């Protein structure tokens, strides 16, 4: 018999034993899958409140608590035993004696398995070695676990299993649980900051008749009643700009976005973004907002603006470095795209510097490829790269001094993009021309180029005030602030291949 077959047979034996115990509970009139249970404390509340009291003080005060959670360890024999109960906040030891809980409840304790959910009422005390514990006066089985937890010492070694069975990961891996609690706090802090600065949170459609707001392949679905194709949104942008037209001057939305693209440590087809728009602002205002927002979140959630990511120490305290994309390319490669160059010259530069390009690319595309291939991953400390070429920025306002470029920036930290923002294009005639240029790109083979959105152009024709806009990938921000190497580590249920 192979080791795998042996393990499978052993698991089947354990499953049967647990089901037998479940049936025995039912035979004894006990529901193995209980209903409501009222507790007075979480484990860490007990520890925080009473850890500093001496053994004698605890005996004198006779403090009673009721706690509930999952049994993670168990030891002892005869008429007494110890176990560790785990809840949301951590673990606490319980001590169960037959003469304290009675014969029936002690039998339930003795037959309980690791992973079972239990409720305990008892007195807080300290053991002889000083561990704060709860001496049970009542022991109740709340839910019988019919499957054993992963082995205590080996845990979930298979990373893919951690992602597929996140519920097990959360049970046995405190760091994973901490990551997702921190994620929630990050989003809460983000909301509070924006609410306090006068932004209005809104909700806009997830299914669009025309995909827009980003260069990406959409997921396509079909509305049966209307008999029309619909697209899962690839960005939140265009509906929020319509709201700016309508007079909602400072808006934001936190929501899911869907892009039918590859999966990597940085990409998941379904991810969370925040997009915000502010009337009468420009990209420089949004730069200031971005660095202050991120620094505020770090300070509020982590208590510091200096964080560790991998081997790098990152300083999030404003102000952050600002550099034009053309200057960044010139510093790194010596190629000066401030000079007027032809497509042929740009292609020669790319060949000389081993920058991979496609035949359909213009000078602006090639400048961007220089940046992405030669510079992006070197930007470790927070850096705003601004002045993107107009060809890759169809929704951004042209720079008035050099219309080859736009008033746009991207934020890079630890070599990856974390935010994208610009002074929004509010000229409907220019916007139509940009969409038409994008259509030509699609015809030339760029299937991520924008489609024409007549409704959006019509909205601009009613007049959109000068506006600054921002998009931040929340998953990547959480990765940064929790020192997570993969986006899957910060998504509760990342997209996986079918087994």
Swiss-Prot record:
InterPro entries tied to this protein: Aa-tRNA-synt_II (IPR004364), aa-tRNA-synth_II (IPR006195), aa-tRNA-synth_II/BPL/LPL (IPR045864), Lys-tRNA-ligase_II (IPR002313), Lys-tRNA-ligase_II_bac/euk (IPR034762), Lys-tRNA-ligase_II_N (IPR044136), Lys-tRNA-synth_II_C (IPR018149), NA-bd_OB-fold (IPR012340)
**Could you tell me the superkingdom of the organism this chain comes from?**
Bacteria
**Record-level GO BP terms:** lysyl-tRNA aminoacylation
Q: Which NCBIfam families match?
A: lysS_bact, PRK00484.1
Q: Please verify whether the record's keywords include ATP-binding.
A: yes
Keyword annotations of the record: Aminoacyl-tRNA synthetase, ATP-binding, Cytoplasm, Ligase, Magnesium, Metal-binding, Nucleotide-binding, Protein biosynthesis
Q: How is the cofactor bound?
A: Binds 3 Mg(2+) ions per subunit.
Asked whether the keyword Lipid biosynthesis is assigned, the reply is no
UniProt-listed Enzyme Commission number(s): 6.1.1.6
Per the record, its GO cellular-component terms are: cytoplasm; cytosol
Tell me the compartments it is located in: Cytoplasm
The UniProt entry, under SUPFAM superfamilies, shows: Class II aaRS and biotin synthetases, Nucleic acid-binding proteins
Q: What is its main location?
A: cytoplasm
- Known catalytic reactions: tRNA(Lys) + L-lysine + ATP = L-lysyl-tRNA(Lys) + AMP + diphosphate
Q: Could you give the subunit structure recorded for this chain? A: Homodimer.
User: What organism does this protein naturally occur in?
Assistant: Bacillus subtilis (strain 168)
- Give binding positions for Mg(2+) 1: 410, 417
Entry's HAMAP family? Answer: Lys_tRNA_synth_class2 (MF_00252)
Cofactor(s) essential for the protein: Mg(2+)
Protein name as annotated: Lysine--tRNA ligase
């Amino acid at each position: 018999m192979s080791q795998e077959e042996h393990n499978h047979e052993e698991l089947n034996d354990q499953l049967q034993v647990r089901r037998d115990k479940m049936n025995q509970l039912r035979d004894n009139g006990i529901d193995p899958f209980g209903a409501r249970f009222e507790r007075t404390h979480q484990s860490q509340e007990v520890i925080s409140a009473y850890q500093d009291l001496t053994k004698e003080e605890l005996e004198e005060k006779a403090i009673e608590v009721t706690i509930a959670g999952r049994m993670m360890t168990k030891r002892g024999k005869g008429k007494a035993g110890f176990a560790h109960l785990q809840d949301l906040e951590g673990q606490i030891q319980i001590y169960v004696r037959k003469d304290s809980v009675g014969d029936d409840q002690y039998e339930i304790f003795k037959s309980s398995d690791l992973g079972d959910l239990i409720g305990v009422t008892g007195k807080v005390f300290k053991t002889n070695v000083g561990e704060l514990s709860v001496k049970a006066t009542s022991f109740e089985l709340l839910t019988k676990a019919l499957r054993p937890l992963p082995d205590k010492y080996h845990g979930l070694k298979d990373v893919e299993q951690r992602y597929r069975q996140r519920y097990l990961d959360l049970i046995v891996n405190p760091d994973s649980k901490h990551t997702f609690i921190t994620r929630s706090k990050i989003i809460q802090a983000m909301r509070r900051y924006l609410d306090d600065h006068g932004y209005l949170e809104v909700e806009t459609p997830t299914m669009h008749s025309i995909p827009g707001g980003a260069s990406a392949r959409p997921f396509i679905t079909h509305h049966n009643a209307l008999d029309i194709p619909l697209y899962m949104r690839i960005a939140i942008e265009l509906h929020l700009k319509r709201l700016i037209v309508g007079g909602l001057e400072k808006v934001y939305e936190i929501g899911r976005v869907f892009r039918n693209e590859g999966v990597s440590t940085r990409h998941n087809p379904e991810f969370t973004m925040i997009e915000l728009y502010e009337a009468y602002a420009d990209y420089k205002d949004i730069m200031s907002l971005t660095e202050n927002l991120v620094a505020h979140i770090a300070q509020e959630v982590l208590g510091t603006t200096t964080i560790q990511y991998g081997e790098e120490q990152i300083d999030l305290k404003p102000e952050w470095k600002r550099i034009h994309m053309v200057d960044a390319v010139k510093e790194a490669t010596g190629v000066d795209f401030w000079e007027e160059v032809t497509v042929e010259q740009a292609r020669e530069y790319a060949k000389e510097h081993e920058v991979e390009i496609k035949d359909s690319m213009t000078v602006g595309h090639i400048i961007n490829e220089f940046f992405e291939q030669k510079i992006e991953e070197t930007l470790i400390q927070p850096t705003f790269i601004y002045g993107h070429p107009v060809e890759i920025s169809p929704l951004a306002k042209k720079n008035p001094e050099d219309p080859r470029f736009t008033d746009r920036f991207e934020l890079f930290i630890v070599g990856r993009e974390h935010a994208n923002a610009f002074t929004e294009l509010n000229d409907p005639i220019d916007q139509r021309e940009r969409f038409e240029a994008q259509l030509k790109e699609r015809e030339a083979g760029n299937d991520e180029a924008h489609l024409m959105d007549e409704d959006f152009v019509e909205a601009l024709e009613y007049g959109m005030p000068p506006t600054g806009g921002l998009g931040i990938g929340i998953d990547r921000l959480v990765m940064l602030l929790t020192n997570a190497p993969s986006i899957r580590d910060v998504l509760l249920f990342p997209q996986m291949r079918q087994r």
